From Swiss-Prot:
Gene3D superfamilies, A to Z: Transcription Factor, Ets-1, Winged helix-like DNA-binding domain superfamily/Winged helix DNA-binding domain
SMART domains from the UniProt entry: ETS, SAM_PNT
Molecular functions (GO terms): DNA-binding transcription factor activity, RNA polymerase II-specific; sequence-specific DNA binding
Protein name, as recorded: Protein C-ets-2
Keyword Phosphoprotein: yes
Xref: PROSITE patterns: ETS_DOMAIN_1, ETS_DOMAIN_2, ETS_DOMAIN_3, PNT
Top-rank taxon, per record: Eukaryota
Species of origin: Bos taurus
Entry GO CC: nucleus
Pfam families, per the entry: Ets (PF00178), Ets1_N_flank (PF19525), SAM_PNT (PF02198)
Length: 470
């Protein structure tokens, strides 16, 4: 045995003579020891050999009573495909109930509807819906660990995977649209003081803005065009707050059909501090406050106005509100009837919060709030329909402004600020001022298709009598 080892060492690794004897003996010993190990394999090697072909020894003794075997990569892929096929069934439910595709936009009611669907689809038991009494934005911000704590045992991973899948699909859609649309060029030095108090510095001649990506109804009404619209110097920019920002750069990220609140990236930098009276209290909502109605129920000419620069309300509420671009497949009237908690007697026929959830517009917007007041009999002393179609009158504009400020948590709201929000709707063809009549306005968008009521039907419900006052 030693001779065999010595010969091999002489051939492979000749060394200095002073160390030759020691190395030869060590090599021979290693060879002998290796031969013994080859004859008597260790217990660990036996276990390793068993684990490779069967995989059974990887299961601990504590899991001997498990009903299901461990998932292999192959079985996981099959399971994932099966879950995706099951999840696709929720899309029909979304269309039926008017639930936005983007979970970030869900109301508490829509979160509950999703869980009810999952309960029926997966035959779940002991599901505590009260634990999920939250909006979609709060739900998506929970994180997986916190979500699993609230979810029923053994199915939390499935529900979380479904939620992640819907969010991912929405993000991918936004990214695809983003690649097809360039950013709006940054425009410095927009805002400057003037006699009106909140005008802007005249925009440069030929300033261009890129159109937003269109989705749903927009694709049919407004064919995509690579030519950008051009803003001339004569256009009205009298809608920015004075001294709100000295220098503003506006950067628009692409807006998909649905996207989480906050993803509209309006970045502004100020070189000076705003004054106290120039706080974020404005009469209207943010730039997207009218777009959900425009992009689903308005005319082509009005839809083209979406390409314009944002109004002064764009900087309100930290620019966190999102566009509602999806068109529900049913009217608001049908939506209310399908709800498990119909509108109570004595309450507004058109609650603003429910209407906001129906249109997927996010926070309550001014036009939605006005419809709530107009559909509430208890508010007819200060705002009411005139009886002439969708025309309405502010009998007490200060009270309307006060209530709007209370709803938006803006105690300094007044009619002057409210009227600025109303004027923003003029060129969007949502609300127009009735000429020759003080405090009289008219909805000029297609409210009938949106609400499912004709003006006469709504007037009859509310007991409205035609206004004979000139």
């Amino acid at each position: 045995m030693n001779d065999f080892g010595i010969k091999n060492m002489d051939q492979v690794a000749p060394v200095a003579s002073s160390y030759r004897g020691t190395l030869k003996r060590q090599a021979a010993f290693d060879t002998f020891d290796g031969s013994l190990l080859a004859v008597f394999p260790s217990l660990n090697e036996e276990q390793t050999l068993q684990e490779v072909p069967t995989g059974l020894d990887s299961i601990s003794h504590d899991s001997a009573n498990c009903e299901l075997p461990l998932l292999t990569p192959c079985s996981k892929a099959v399971m994932s495909q099966a879950l995706k096929a099951t999840f696709s069934g929720f899309k029909k439910e979304q269309r039926r109930l008017g639930i936005p595709k983007n979970p970030w936009l869900w109301t508490e009611q829509q979160v509950c509807q999703w869980l009810l669907w999952a309960t029926n689809e997966f035959s779940l038991v002991d599901v505590n819906l009260q634990r999920f009494g939250m909006t979609g934005q709060v739900l998506c911000n929970l994180g997986k660990e916190r979500f699993l704590e609230l979810a029923p045992d053994f199915v939390g991973d499935i529900l979380w995977e479904h939620l992640e899948q819907m969010i991912k699909e929405n993000q991918e859609k936004n990214e695809d649209q983003y690649e097809e649309n360039s950013h709006l060029n940054s425009v410095p030095h927009w805002i400057n003081s003037n006699s009106l108090g909140f005008g802007v510095e005249q925009a440069p001649y030929g300033m261009q803005t890129q159109s937003y990506p269109k989705g749903g109804l927009l694709d049919g009404l407004c064919p995509a065009s690579s030519a950008p619209s051009t803003l001339g110097p004569e256009q009205d920019f009298q809608m920015f707050p004075k001294a709100r920002l000295n220098t503003v750069s506006v950067n628009y990220c692409s807006v998909g059909q649905d996207f989480p609140a906050g993803s509209l990236n309006l970045l502004s930098s100020a070189s000076g501090k705003p004054r106290d009276h120039d706080s974020a209290e404005t009469g209207g909502d943010s730039f997207e406050s009218s777009e959900s109605l425009l992009q689903s129920w308005n005319s082509q000419s009005s839809l083209l106005d979406v390409q314009r620069v944002p109004s002064f309300e764009s900087f309100e509420d930290d620019c966190s509100q999102s566009l509602g671009l999806s068109k529900p497949t049913m009217s608001f009237k049908d939506y209310i009837q399908d709800r498990s908690d119909p509108v109570e007697q004595g309450k507004p026929v058109i609650p603003a919060a429910v209407l906001a959830g129906f249109t997927g517009s996010g926070p309550i917007q001014l036009w939605q709030f006005l419809l709530e007041l107009l559909s509430d009999k208890s508010c007819q002393s200060f705002i009411s329909w005139t009886g002439d179609g969708w025309e309405f009158k502010l009998a007490d504009p200060d009270e309307v402004a006060r209530r709007w400020g209370k709803r938006k948590n803006k105690p300094k709201m007044n009619y002057e600020k409210l009227s600025r929000g109303l004027r923003y709707y003029y060129d969007k063809n949502i609300i127009h001022k009735t000429s020759g009549k003080r405090y009289v306005y008219r909805f000029v968008c297609d409210l009938q298709n949106l609400l499912g009521f004709t003006p006469e039907e709504l007037h009859a419900i509310l007991g409205v009598q035609p206004d004979t006052e000139d």
